[in-house]
């Protein structure tokens, strides 16, 4: 296409008044015929391809600029939000000044101590006045100071909607509070403004109400003994952040500046430590042996039963279980930390240590209470491990990525669940890998990729399964075999959809099935034979392919028979004759030389030669697909194909009156009976491994079908 013609066509299509219907009408009137329309169609198509390439090039060139612009917009939005936050913070500080006067008036001399919690700017006073000391009591003041703390907490929480029940908790007081900004944990996008109230035993998170000044709405309440605090490394513009881990969720908050962030981290850790010390002392007091009751003589109490003495002995033994060791007291909290930090091995090691320590020991109430706390952590740990093996997690790590979670579930006694989750995870991975394969190019190329992806994944899964579940219940291996059968069904669905549903040729289908069988045999390296499964799943599709190709051969043979003139073949050139000899030799006809004459003539009919090549080609491709379940299908298809040819020869021989043509027909019949049929029979026996009686009967019969000599039509 010339440049001038292309530019003229482009200008015409780009014009504002262009109408496709009018343009096509004028083009049809001006064209001389089909050739002009085809040429114009090619020009339009070339212009469309050129436009598409230019569009792709422009998109690629502007892509980087688009990304940079989006990033700058995000940064600008963040800075504007920070500015709005600072202005609102200043406004809130001014509005909260009256609240600072309430605890000051109530506390009297300790006014400076009790002004804590009045707003974001007095966090230092809150920390100094209300943070518990090492002994679990306030650092300064008692009596009036305690009442001031409670009144300050009550005053602040009255500004939070939906937390009336919290005000009734005895002994609870405010430690620290301040404004924060919450971010999405996955995409690091700003979610909302919140206000945190840290009490001596919990953390209250409330969302800011923009319509009502200085008011908040209750959002969440987290006990400190189930809360883990993690510092988030600064990554500008995302800075001054820390993360709170509460199974099964996590939340990220941003402080106003680095100083306030440090205060939050310090006060959270110190408050958690004080709460842990307090509860440990309570457990030690509960587990401490009680003073024995005064012993009275038997004589002074003649009604005392001897059973009381027997019952006292087990009780004394039960009280001998020592739970005062530091690692036992801190075990629930250590388990929470391990779960939050994803230290699954450490958590299971702690559980094993506890179980070993309490083995063969009685279970008094303190032990049962400890067991209840530990069981709750075990449940949480199990849920985390189950989530690690869920298909929602990333599947790119392969089977080895699941080993950590599977091994810990097995150590927790969850072998069956670990097996189920592992196989479900791998099924999702195999399904995703198959779905992500691009269907492009030749079918055989796609099948090579499909087999490589599927059988490699299956082999890796089997090896990892054998590693993870070695020494476990044999029922797990049965589950793996069932899973492998299901995965093979998934593979066959994708295989059949591309090979058989798309109506590929029999030769292509045979090559694809051969590739699949070769890959399937590789599983024998690990003692897994799934060949019978792939045969069972493919037998229906292969039967359909054989039947379809058989019908094609029969229709083609009948069409050639209808045009049969019973004349010798003239190949015109020695090269064509040599090529035909090679083709017949590859079909197994070794004595074809005796049917060739001088000057490139062949003493056989074109119909018989074409039938021979087509039948032998069908047999060779069918043998590539063969397995025992297809024996009768293949044999019956061959018999039907051969019957069409021999019936036509038999009918022509009975009806032909010309002696010369009749002799030529006999020569073709002799070629069919004495050369072609023995070759078919021998090749079938080589491929299958046993002879076929039906083919022997066809060869030995002098007439395959008796036809009325007076009839002029052949009914097949």
From Swiss-Prot:
<dbReference type="GO" id="GO:0006904">
    <property type="term" value="P:vesicle docking involved in exocytosis"/>
</dbReference>
<dbReference type="GO" id="GO:0048471">
    <property type="term" value="C:perinuclear region of cytoplasm"/>
</dbReference>
<feature type="domain" description="PH">
    <location>
        <begin position="173"/>
        <end position="273"/>
    </location>
</feature>
<dbReference type="InterPro" id="IPR042561">
    <property type="entry name" value="Exo84_C_1"/>
</dbReference>
<dbReference type="InterPro" id="IPR001849">
    <property type="entry name" value="PH_domain"/>
</dbReference>
<dbReference type="GO" id="GO:0007032">
    <property type="term" value="P:endosome organization"/>
</dbReference>
<keyword id="KW-0597">Phosphoprotein</keyword>
<dbReference type="GO" id="GO:0000281">
    <property type="term" value="P:mitotic cytokinesis"/>
</dbReference>
<protein>
    <recommendedName>
        <fullName>Exocyst complex component 8</fullName>
    </recommendedName>
</protein>
<dbReference type="GO" id="GO:0035091">
    <property type="term" value="F:phosphatidylinositol binding"/>
</dbReference>
<comment type="function">
    <text>Component of the exocyst complex involved in the docking of exocytic vesicles with fusion sites on the plasma membrane.</text>
</comment>
<feature type="region of interest" description="Disordered">
    <location>
        <begin position="129"/>
        <end position="150"/>
    </location>
</feature>
<dbReference type="GO" id="GO:0005886">
    <property type="term" value="C:plasma membrane"/>
</dbReference>
<dbReference type="InterPro" id="IPR011993">
    <property type="entry name" value="PH-like_dom_sf"/>
</dbReference>
<dbReference type="GO" id="GO:0090522">
    <property type="term" value="P:vesicle tethering involved in exocytosis"/>
</dbReference>
<feature type="compositionally biased region" description="Acidic residues">
    <location>
        <begin position="303"/>
        <end position="319"/>
    </location>
</feature>
<comment type="subunit">
    <text>The exocyst complex is composed of EXOC1, EXOC2, EXOC3, EXOC4, EXOC5, EXOC6, EXOC7 and EXOC8. Interacts (via PH domain) with GTP-bound RALA and RALB. Interacts with SH3BP1; required for the localization of both SH3BP1 and the exocyst to the leading edge of migrating cells.</text>
</comment>
<keyword id="KW-0813">Transport</keyword>
<keyword id="KW-0653">Protein transport</keyword>
<keyword id="KW-0268">Exocytosis</keyword>
<dbReference type="InterPro" id="IPR042560">
    <property type="entry name" value="Exo84_C_2"/>
</dbReference>
<dbReference type="GO" id="GO:0006887">
    <property type="term" value="P:exocytosis"/>
</dbReference>
<dbReference type="GO" id="GO:0000145">
    <property type="term" value="C:exocyst"/>
</dbReference>
<comment type="similarity">
    <text>Belongs to the EXO84 family.</text>
</comment>
<dbReference type="GO" id="GO:0090148">
    <property type="term" value="P:membrane fission"/>
</dbReference>
<dbReference type="GO" id="GO:0030426">
    <property type="term" value="C:growth cone"/>
</dbReference>
<dbReference type="InterPro" id="IPR016159">
    <property type="entry name" value="Cullin_repeat-like_dom_sf"/>
</dbReference>
<dbReference type="GO" id="GO:0022617">
    <property type="term" value="P:extracellular matrix disassembly"/>
</dbReference>
<feature type="modified residue" description="Phosphoserine">
    <location>
        <position position="15"/>
    </location>
</feature>
<dbReference type="Pfam" id="PF16528">
    <property type="entry name" value="Exo84_C"/>
</dbReference>
<dbReference type="InterPro" id="IPR032403">
    <property type="entry name" value="Exo84_C"/>
</dbReference>
<dbReference type="Pfam" id="PF08700">
    <property type="entry name" value="VPS51_Exo84_N"/>
</dbReference>
<feature type="region of interest" description="Disordered">
    <location>
        <begin position="275"/>
        <end position="319"/>
    </location>
</feature>
<dbReference type="GO" id="GO:0031267">
    <property type="term" value="F:small GTPase binding"/>
</dbReference>
<dbReference type="GO" id="GO:0005770">
    <property type="term" value="C:late endosome"/>
</dbReference>
<feature type="compositionally biased region" description="Basic and acidic residues">
    <location>
        <begin position="275"/>
        <end position="284"/>
    </location>
</feature>
<dbReference type="InterPro" id="IPR033961">
    <property type="entry name" value="Exo84"/>
</dbReference>
<dbReference type="GO" id="GO:0015031">
    <property type="term" value="P:protein transport"/>
</dbReference>
<feature type="modified residue" description="Phosphothreonine">
    <location>
        <position position="313"/>
    </location>
</feature>
<keyword id="KW-0963">Cytoplasm</keyword>
<keyword id="KW-0966">Cell projection</keyword>
């Amino acid at each position: 296409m010339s440049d001038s013609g292309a530019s003229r066509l482009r200008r015409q299509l780009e014009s504002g008044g262009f109408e496709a219907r009018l343009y096509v009408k004028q083009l049809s009137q001006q064209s001389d015929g089909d050739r002009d329309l085809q040429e114009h169609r090619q020009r339009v198509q070339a212009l469309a391809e050129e436009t598409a390439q230019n569009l792709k090039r422009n998109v690629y060139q502007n892509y980087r600029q688009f990304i940079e612009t989006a990033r700058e917009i995000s940064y600008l939005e963040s800075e504007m939000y920070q500015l709005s936050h600072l202005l609102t913070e200043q406004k809130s500080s001014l509005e909260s000044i009256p609240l600072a006067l309430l605890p000051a008036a109530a506390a009297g001399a300790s006014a400076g101590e009790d002004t804590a919690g009045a707003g974001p700017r007095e966090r230092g006073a809150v920390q100094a006045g209300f943070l518990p000391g090492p002994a679990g009591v306030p650092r300064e003041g008692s009596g009036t100071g305690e009442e001031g703390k409670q009144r300050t907490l009550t005053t602040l929480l009255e500004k939070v909607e939906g937390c009336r029940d919290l005000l009734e908790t005895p002994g609870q007081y405010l430690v620290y509070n301040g404004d924060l900004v919450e971010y999405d944990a996955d995409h690091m996008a700003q979610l909302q403004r919140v206000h945190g109230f840290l009490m001596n035993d919990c953390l209250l998170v409330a969302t800011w109400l923009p319509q009502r000044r200085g008011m908040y709405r209750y959002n969440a309440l987290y006990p400190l003994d189930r809360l883990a605090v993690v510092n988030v490394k600064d990554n500008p513009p995302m800075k001054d952040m820390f993360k709170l881990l509460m199974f099964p969720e996590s939340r990220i908050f941003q402080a106003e500046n680095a100083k306030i962030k440090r205060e939050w981290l310090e006060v959270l850790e110190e408050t958690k430590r004080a709460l842990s010390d307090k509860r440990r002392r309570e457990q030690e007091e509960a587990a401490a042996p009680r003073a024995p009751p005064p012993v009275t003589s038997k004589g002074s109490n003649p009604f005392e039963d001897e059973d009381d003495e027997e019952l006292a002995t087990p009780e004394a033994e039960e009280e001998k279980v020592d739970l005062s060791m530091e690692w036992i007291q801190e075990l629930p909290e250590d388990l929470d930390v391990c779960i939050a930090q994803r230290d699954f091995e450490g958590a299971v090691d702690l559980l094993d240590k506890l179980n070993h320590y309490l083995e063969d020991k009685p279970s008094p109430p303190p032990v049962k209470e400890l067991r209840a706390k530990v069981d709750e952590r075990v449940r949480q740990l199990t849920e985390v491990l189950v989530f690690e093996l869920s298909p929602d997690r990333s599947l790119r790590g392969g089977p080895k990525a699941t080993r950590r979670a599977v091994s810990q579930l097995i150590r927790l006694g969850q072998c069956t669940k670990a097996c189920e989750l592992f196989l479900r995870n791998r099924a999702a991975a195999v399904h995703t890998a198959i779905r992500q394969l691009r269907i492009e190019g030749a079918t055989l190329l796609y099948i090579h990729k499909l087999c490589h992806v599927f059988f490699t994944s299956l082999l890796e899964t089997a090896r990892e399964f054998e590693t993870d579940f070695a020494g476990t219940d044999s029922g797990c291996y049965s589950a793996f075999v069932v899973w492998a059968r299901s995965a093979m069904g998934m593979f066959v669905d994708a295989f059949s959809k591309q090979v058989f549903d798309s109506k590929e040729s029999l030769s292509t289908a045979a090559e694809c099935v051969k590739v699949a069988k070769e890959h399937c045999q590789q599983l024998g390296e690990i003692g897994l034979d799934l060949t019978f499964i792939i045969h069972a799943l493919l037998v229906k599709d292969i039967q359909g392919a054989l039947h379809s190709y058989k019908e094609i051969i029969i229709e083609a043979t009948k069409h050639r028979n209808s045009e049969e003139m019973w004349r010798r073949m003239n190949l015109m050139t020695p090269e064509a004759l040599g090529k035909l000899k090679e083709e017949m030799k590859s079909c197994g006809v070794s004595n074809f030389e005796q049917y060739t004459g001088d000057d490139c003539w062949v003493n056989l009919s074109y119909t018989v030669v074409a039938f021979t090549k087509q039948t032998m080609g069908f047999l060779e491709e069918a043998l590539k697909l063969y397995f025992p379940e297809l024996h009768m299908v293949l044999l019956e298809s061959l018999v039907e194909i051969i019957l069409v040819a021999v019936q036509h020869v038999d009918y022509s021989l009975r009806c032909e009156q010309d002696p010369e043509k009749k002799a030529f027909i006999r020569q073709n019949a002799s070629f069919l009976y004495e050369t072609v049929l023995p070759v078919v029979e021998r090749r079938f026996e080589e491929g299958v491994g046993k002879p076929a009686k039906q083919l022997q009967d066809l060869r030995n019969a002098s007439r395959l079908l008796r036809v009325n000599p007076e009839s002029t039509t052949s009914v097949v």
